[in-house]
Regions:
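Beta-rich ligand-recognition domains in immune and ubiquitin systems
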Residues: 1-144
Length: 144
């Protein structure tokens, strides 16, 4: 993944970058965390996926496993995301997959975190129609 200079966008590069080892870098997946994490309050951000066919977006705990080789190797529910392989939409955690059938195929998503209520909701940012909400007990810093 290539991060823009202003650190506001990311895209899939043509080839893998040769970067020094960093314990905060995800090894097995195409993942990047936002610079700011949240430990309280209500927060909203938007993610534009454009016309991409395969993508995933969401949030993760600060301690989300970054060196595991497969999502199934996680012991805790540390990542919550919405994604598609171009054919079907899914709500995903490290241990669960829920198939979704949205009426729309948004190009821009809204993500709403209510830390105290333990909710992470996904919306079509253009129509504000609800897509899916995860309920969890966060108990640590959450990153977009």
């Amino acid at each position: 993944l290539s991060l823009s200079l202003d650190r506001r966008s990311v895209k899939l590069g043509e080839r893998r970058q040769d970067l020094p080892e960093n314990p905060k870098r995800f090894q097995a997946d195409y993942c990047v965390l936002g610079a700011e994490g949240f430990t309280s309050g209500r927060h909203y951000w938007e993610v534009e996926i454009g016309g991409r066919r395969g993508w995933a977006l969401g949030a993760a705990r600060e301690t989300a496993g970054r060196k595991e080789r497969s999502p199934g190797s996680h012991q805790k529910r540390e990542i919550w995301c919405l994604g598609t392989n171009g054919k079907k939409y899914q709500a995903l955690t490290a241990t669960e997959q829920t198939c979704l059938a949205p009426n729309e195929r948004p190009r821009r998503f809204g993500v709403y975190l209510d830390y105290e209520r333990g909710q992470l909701g996904f919306y079509n940012a253009e129509s504000m129609s609800h897509i899916h909400t995860f309920n969890a007990s966060f108990r640590e810093r959450i990153f977009p």
